[in-house]
Regions:
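P-loop NTPase Walker
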Residues: 16, 57, 106-112, 138-327, ...
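Phosphoinositide-dependent membrane-docking surfaces
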Residues: 68-70, 76-95
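Conserved helicase NTPase motor core
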Residues: 177-181, 187, 194-252, 257-261, ...
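Helicase P-loop NTPase motor core
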Residues: 257-260, 375, 387, 676-678, ...
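Conserved P-loop NTPase-based nucleic-acid remodeling module centered on helicase motor cores
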Residues: 277, 282-285, 289-362, 477-537, ...
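Conserved RecA-like helicase ATPase core segment
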Residues: 471, 476-477, 631-720
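A short beta-strand element within the Helicase C-terminal
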Residues: 789-818
């Protein structure tokens, strides 16, 4: 952007959008100037005769095709560089004579001893002819830059090309020529090119902002009328900005569909695109249909078509292959696909090679390897065991991967074993349970212990080293005393790869001979407990996941290398590959494709150039849900069309479909993935109030990976609009009071406007009331409308009120403790480092479905970690809308003392109610409830105190063994004795005459 006397940098006070259109038009064509390249011009100069005696030489200067060159008397030729003619220091005047110092392609060249008049005339001649030669080129460059920058929004790619063109031209003339250098040459193009060459990033941003301002003013009426409500300032800006790649971060309720419609309409209204040049993409048929309906209603039958990715892929395939592809029935019938995969699997199991592969997999690679020493607590290690459901080839649940490998090896070698049987001699006492060795080999009378120690004798961080070694010593002594045979195995042997050698050596020393089971026998055992059928189902899932990724060359190897357990993944894929071949052969034989082919083949055809993209503008809805394969297709389509712009609308806070292959990194790292990018955040939600927004936004932003974007609300409130009901979920006998859910629904019916909508949302479908219960509630509360949805199904919907159910901890809790199979995990996008990242976003989605108010229901005995976080973080939630018992106030603080991560939950046995760790049987810790009221008891110093405020019963704990102390009568009166006391045998004999209870312990921390 340049005026007649243009500065070298943009002046921020100038309206650059005006100047760029005014002054570019002033660039003139230089048709009147001679074409210097078509003429041969030369000028000879000789030094003063006197100076020739001192070595001064004559030369001829020529204007040739390559530019100005000088030819010396000796026929040496040099090309004169532009800086020589732009630099006033080239002509140097002395007392008697002058000289020219010219920069050439071989270095400086000096011509001295020249008459001043001759030297000056030559310099001006060189400069004039140089400018005459350059002027048309510079004018052409200026015109090309003008044409480039008047195509529309100043995209980074266009600006970089323009700046490169200008810098290349500037290198030819170095500086803007002065008017007296050549009267026939105008300096405007030179100035314009010099300014463009010197543009900085802030100059470019001002240029873009000026363009946006002009467009917003020009199309203000369009943006006011294109939707039922005028677009907001940010929505309009998002429609106008047309960078090479555009990301619109549209928070919940901010009107992303309005932006999609407004963007498409603006491109047509402004003449930047025809309808046939615009591609609009959605993920689901329903979403595409709704988008199409909205476009037709707001823009008329303009010719824009909203398509799904699969429909797009199918059209690309049809254009390349000349016919519409046929869809395999298996693509729409998961049960039929699973049956077909099972049939192929069973056929392969008949071959010896495949039998060996499957047995090796089950023996060594069925579970992901994990070192117990890498976990911080026993509870975390138990989480790993529970999540992977570690079982032997015989189907037994075991407590460690090492034990599983030992059992599998013994089984495969034909050695009968029993897992954790009671020792043949009685060892139980009031202090200790009966000893149960890890394994017993009944045919040989041999016990096996697998010790969790490293080579230095260290234990895992959460295991008391001294007590563990005492236990090891006690076991050795016991076997020695009773004369029973024991072999000992160690964790470090597994880590060092010598575990099976150790088993072989010790059993051989005891004269145990192996009788390896034939593969058929091993497979038969695996069938007995459903392992073969389960693996067949897994193969069907792996087949779908593998094909959905549409791998290109090298990507499979990368997926294996990046997996947390590469050997396990590699072993599984070797079993999957024959199934993949069978499936592809079936498709080829039938001449059919599946949904994954619609993406994969389209990617291939666009990449290879077999499909020519007609689209200059690609608009993608719900971009946070995009997979790597779909992102690849979008990138190839963008690169296949000249000046194609990518426009993506999504919200990283609502990315909840990783399990289908969605990769959030394409949103959070959009610029790194796609290149030059403009990010616009829609900052105003029309759905929920500030109370919901404050809680939901703060909650989701605990994950630092989420983009921190502003989100304002139209409805400002001064009181909490997220409420928590804390109530015991245990069924009570003879209790006919309302359920927790009905209490909330009754409350909503009392405060809501008639006709208000209420969503009941659950992490899983079984969290929700069944159809009969929902009908009963609907009849009882006719003033409100009730609907049930899983949180995933509620995405994109909204209601006046939302009730979130299933906020519990555990495998099917919220956040879910259920883990993705490690093999499927390896084929999914990389797992985020932040704990429960996607589950956190899922709760954000649940919260932001509500317009007026959200209700959370939880039992604090098994409360979700998210509920505990809301309480501990002192979020602005209403805790007083419903009455809450003191036990519910305290329960979330009562964790299992042994494993530290488990929660003590009520259980019933033949002896009555007790509280046990929810990680049982891995963690067997249990405690009695209060003898008076059956409520849970909390630990405070050496006391157990009932959490029931109407009871507050207390019991002292034995400092020797940890059992409860009870009052007894003796010869000298009452005393306190340990509950583990017995008159004979091993027991605890600790007694105390007096125990004083500290009443200050009743002052509860949570009060």
């Amino acid at each position: 952007v340049v005026a007649e006397a243009a500065p070298t940098r943009l002046n921020p006070s100038v309206k650059w959008s005006v100047l760029i259109f005014q002054h570019m038009r002033r660039i003139e064509k230089y048709d009147c100037l001679p074409d210097m390249n078509s003429q041969y011009c030369s000028k000879h100069i000789a030094p003063h005769w006197l100076m020739r005696f001192f070595g001064a030489e004559s030369a001829t200067f020529q204007l040739a095709g390559k530019g100005l060159q000088v030819v010396t008397k000796n026929d040496d030729r040099y090309l004169i560089l532009a800086e020589s003619l732009a630099n006033d220091g080239t002509f140097q005047e002395g007392t008697l004579f002058a000289r020219l110092v010219l920069q050439t392609n071989t270095g400086p060249k000096t011509f001295s001893g020249l008459r001043k008049k001759d030297a000056q005339a030559l310099f001006w001649w060189l400069r004039e002819h140089w400018l005459r030669q350059l002027a048309p080129e510079v004018a052409k460059t200026a015109e090309d830059i003008r044409a480039l920058l008047t195509q529309g929004y100043p995209r980074q790619s266009r600006l970089e090309v323009a700046r490169a063109m200008a810098q290349q031209a500037l290198a030819r003339f170095v500086r803007v020529p002065e008017p007296e250098w050549c009267a026939d040459v105008r300096d405007v193009p030179f100035k314009w090119v010099a300014v463009v060459a010197g543009w900085q990033d802030d100059d470019l941003e001002k240029l873009r902002q000026s363009y946006v301002t002009c467009q917003l003013q020009r199309y203000a009426d369009f943006f006011t009328a294109v939707e039922s409500q005028p677009l907001t300032e940010r929505q309009r800006e998002a429609c106008v900005v047309d960078e090479d790649n555009n990301l619109v971060l549209a928070g919940a309720g901010t009107g992303k569909t309005s932006v999609m419609v407004g963007r498409a309409g603006y491109l047509i209204e402004s003449g930047q695109a025809h309808a046939s040049e615009i591609l609009m993409l959605a993920f689901a048929n329903k979403a595409a249909a709704e988008m199409q309906k909205r476009i037709d209603r707001r823009l008329g039958k303009c010719g824009i078509t909203a398509s799904t990715f699969h429909k797009l892929g199918k059209e690309i395939i049809a254009r390349v292959e000349g016919q519409q592809p046929s869809l395999t029935p298996l693509a729409e019938d998961d049960k039929a696909l699973a049956l077909q995969v099972n049939q192929w699997f069973e056929e392969h199991l008949k071959t010896p090679a495949y039998q060996q592969l499957i047995i090796k997999y089950f023996q060594h690679h069925l579970y992901p390897a994990a070192n117990p020493f890498d976990f911080e607590s026993e509870g975390q290690y138990f989480d790993y065991i529970l999540a992977n459901d570690i079982r032997t080839l015989k189907g037994e649940a075991v407590k460690s991967l090492g034990e599983c490998l030992v059992a599998n090896y013994l089984f495969k070698q034909g050695i009968e074993y029993k897992y954790e049987p009671a020792y043949e001699h009685r060892t139980a006492s009031p202090l200790y349970r009966q000893y149960q060795p890890d394994f017993y080999l009944p045919e040989h009378g041999i016990y096996v212990e697998y010790y969790g120690v490293d080579r230095e004798g260290n234990t895992a961080p959460y295991v008391d080293r001294e007590k563990y070694h005492q236990s090891m010593a006690w076991k050795r002594q016991l076997h020695a005393e009773k004369g029973t045979r024991l072999i000992e195995l160690y964790h470090y042997e597994l880590q060092e790869g010598g575990l099976f050698d150790a088993i072989d050596a010790q059993l051989a020393a005891l004269n145990v001979e192996y009788q390896p089971l034939p593969p058929e026998a091993v497979l038969a055992t695996l069938r007995e407990f459903g392992a073969i059928r389960g693996f067949s189902t897994l193969l069907a899932d792996l087949l779908k996941r593998y094909r959905a990724n549409c791998y290109e060359k090298g990507q499979v190897e990368a997926a294996i290398a990046n997996a947390s357990n590469p050997e396990q993944v590699d072993a599984a894929l070797s079993l999957l590959q024959p199934i993949l071949n069978d499936y592809q052969a079936l498709l080829d034989r039938e001449g059919q494709i599946d949904f994954d082919d619609m993406i994969g083949k389209a990617v291939q055809y666009v990449r290879e150039g077999r499909f020519r993209s007609p689209w200059r503008y690609i608009l993608v809805d719900e971009f946070q849900d995009i997979s790597e394969a779909r992102a690849r297709l979008v990138q190839y389509l963008r690169d296949a069309a000249k000046d194609c712009s990518l426009f993506c609308v999504g919200d990283d806070w609502q990315a909840i479909y990783r399990f289908t292959g969605s990769d959030l990194s394409f949103t959070t790292a959009f610029r790194e993935k796609f290149g030059s990018t403009k990010i616009t955040a829609l900052d105003l939600t029309f759905r929920f109030n500030s109370g919901i927004s404050d809680v939901a936004t703060r909650f989701v932003l605990q994950n630092p990976v989420q983009v921190n974007k502003p989100l304002n609300t139209l409805d400002k409130v001064k009181h909490p609009t997220v409420s928590l009901l804390r109530e015991d979920n245990r069924p009570r006998q003879n209790s006919d009071g309302p359920s927790r859910l009905e209490k909330v629904i009754s409350r909503i019916a009392d405060i809501a406007e008639p006709g208000s909508s209420v969503y009941l949302l659950g992490r899983y479908g079984f969290n929700l009331p069944d159809r009969r219960e929902l009908q009963r509630l609907a009849v009882r509360y006719p003033s409100i409308t009730l609907e049930c949805h899983t949180v995933h199904a509620s995405k994109g919907k909204e209601a006046d009120y939302v009730v979130v159910l299933g906020l519990e901890t555990g495998k099917f809790g919220f956040p879910t403790g259920k883990t993705t199979h490690p093999l499927l995990e390896a084929l999914l996008p990389p797992l985020e480092g932040y704990p429960h990242a996607e589950e956190r976003r899922l709760l954000y989605v649940a919260l932001t479905r509500a317009r007026c108010r959200v209700y959370l229901i939880a039992d604090m005995a098994v409360a979700s970690d998210f509920v505990v976080e809301l309480l501990k973080g002192q979020y602005e939630i209403d805790l007083n809308e419903f009455s809450t018992s003191l036990s519910q106030h305290l329960l979330h603080m009562l964790k299992c003392m042994k494993c530290e991560t488990g929660t003590m939950v009520p259980r019933q046995s033949q002896f009555g109610l007790f509280f046990g760790c929810n990680k049982f049987p891995l963690c067997a810790h249990k405690e009695r409830g209060c003898e008076r009221c059956e409520s849970q008891m909390r630990r405070a110093g050496r006391f157990k105190i009932c959490i029931n405020p109407d009871c507050f019963n207390w019991v002292p704990v034995c400092p020797q063994c940890g059992a409860e102390m009870v009052q007894r009568n003796g010869r000298h009166g009452e005393f306190w004795g340990c509950k583990n006391y017995r008159h004979e045998g091993e027991c605890c004999r600790h007694t105390e005459n007096e125990i004083i209870f500290d009443q200050n312990l009743l002052i509860l921390e949570s009060a």
